[in-house]
Amino acid sequence: WIINEAIKLEKNVINLYNSYSYHKAVQNIHNFCVNELGGIYLDIVKDRLYTCSADSQARRSCQTSLDVLLNILIRLIAPVLSYTAEEIWQLSSNLINQEKSVFLSKFSSRKNTKDTKISSLEWDRIFEIKDSVNQSIEEMRNNNELKGSLDAIVNIEVNTDDFLILD
């Protein structure tokens, strides 16, 4: 999901740069980092990064996604945050297909987002369910019934359609 969202962002930002709408490009990058990346994805995967063993598939999958995201975001910020982008590029020696400088690299030539088994409407429903669960957990934490979200045991009752999405 997050990589598809980043690919959509990349296409949109490149179009905005090509039309000299730099302020809109920066706004789109900022909104992605705040909403999708910080507000959803990192919140979901942070526990996986902290608790899974270093060689677990769940953790490695997350690290690979973060590497792809970093690669996309560095290229997108380079036209407006030149020194910052170059410094990150130089310090990130493990980036995929890394040139000597971010300015020698090209924007991606991805034509389409990757096909996924889950539609955007289904993702919206998943996030609605996630928000409902998080709200319940937060209420339990406020009532001192729970120390943290990792202590929660969650049972979700859903209809058939939601079950098929969550399965």
Region annotations inferred by a language model:
Residues 1-11, 43-136, 143, 148-160, ...:
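Acidic, turn-prone loop/beta-hairpin segments
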Residues 26-30:
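Aromatic-lined ligand-binding clefts that engage carbohydrates, nucleic acids, or primary amines
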Residues 17-24:
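Short helix-adjacent coil turns
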